[in-house]
Amino acid sequence: MRHFARINGADADLWGAVGLLHDLDFERYPDMPTADPDVAALSHMLVTEGPISAQLPGHPFYGVAHLREHGWSAEVRRAILAHADYSGVHPESPMEKTLIAVDELSSFVIAVALVRASKSIFDVDVAAVKKKLKDKAFARAVNREDIVRGAAGLDISLDDMIQHVVTALRGDAERLGLQGVSPGA
């Protein structure tokens, strides 16, 4: 997210926070409701400052409610809701569209790096990622259609999107533990 914020001339800290926080409730509240008018109305309540008068149905609603309670902006809350296609919040801003685009792809690229003998993001390129995308057994929980739609939502090619994510992860390789291991380690 920070990489794409810099490309867009946006606040890298804000975009980075959205990237870190968007799934903060997923382990505890993994349920994802069906899209319907009630869910959309709840999303609207969570973005605005009005009272929340409905039961929270699961991810990402609990996380967004928590962020609202702790003073996070409507911009952040809306971006997090927009990444859930069932929330009724359609992505509009570059930050919202980018979160959707990198959500599945960044995890997928990390998985590609970690199955390499070197465990290094520096040994991952676009061709390696695309080859693994074709292997439906690899990282089977990752929704490939979401990856393709994410790139399209940013109006960039899938190859360019993958390259951006690889580049971003390389820039943070040490912190993410993706700099690799020594042979025989």
Where are these regions (language model features)?
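Feature captures the catalytic cores and cofactor-binding loops of soluble hydro-lyases/lyases
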Residues: 184
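Residues at alpha-helix termini
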Residues: 3-7, 69, 135, 153, ...
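Metal-centered catalytic cores of metalloenzymes
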Residues: 74, 89-90, 163, 171-179
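Active-site hotspot residues in diverse enzymes, especially metal/ion-binding acidic/histidine motifs
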Residues: 2-6, 12, 156-172, 181
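N-terminal cap/leader regions of alpha/beta-hydrolase-fold enzymes
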Residues: 53-56, 69, 156, 160, ...
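C-terminal binding/interaction regions
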Residues: 128, 134-161, 176
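Divalent metal-dependent catalytic cores for phosphoryl transfer on phosphate-bearing substrates
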Residues: 8-136, 148
